[in-house]
């Protein structure tokens, strides 16, 4: 059974083009970072969940690339473009080896379970 919501799986060509071209410079920067770095955190200033995941990854010795797009009152349209592109509604957005694993809680869960990050930690 698919976990995608049915309404989100059907888009017209115009909608798909809009999503793909809305702040394409930002999307290209995120995609390039995901391609060139094993772990990427996409976030925003002053967000406690973003701060927490950055702190926890650092404490665990996981090297990561951090991309910050504004704060609560700036760059909202750029953050919206990332949300539309990934389909994930909140920040941070954490990518490991090119795969979106989720946000802060998901990342901490993966760290605690040791499923994704063991080989990424500094010895």
Curated annotation (Swiss-Prot):
Q: Which GO terms describe its cellular component?
A: mitochondrial matrix
Using the record's annotation, list all stretches that form the Glutaredoxin domain. Answer: 27-123
Q: Which InterPro entries match?
A: Thioredoxin-like_sf
Superkingdom of source? Eukaryota
Keyword vocabulary terms for this entry: Electron transport, Redox-active center, Transport
Q: Keyword check for Kinase, yes or no.
A: no
By sequence similarity, the record places it as follows: Belongs to the glutaredoxin family.
This protein is called what? Glutaredoxin-like protein
Q: Which organism is it from?
A: Dictyostelium discoideum
Q: Which lineage ranks, top first, belong to the organism behind this chain?
A: Eukaryota, Amoebozoa, Evosea, Eumycetozoa, Dictyostelia
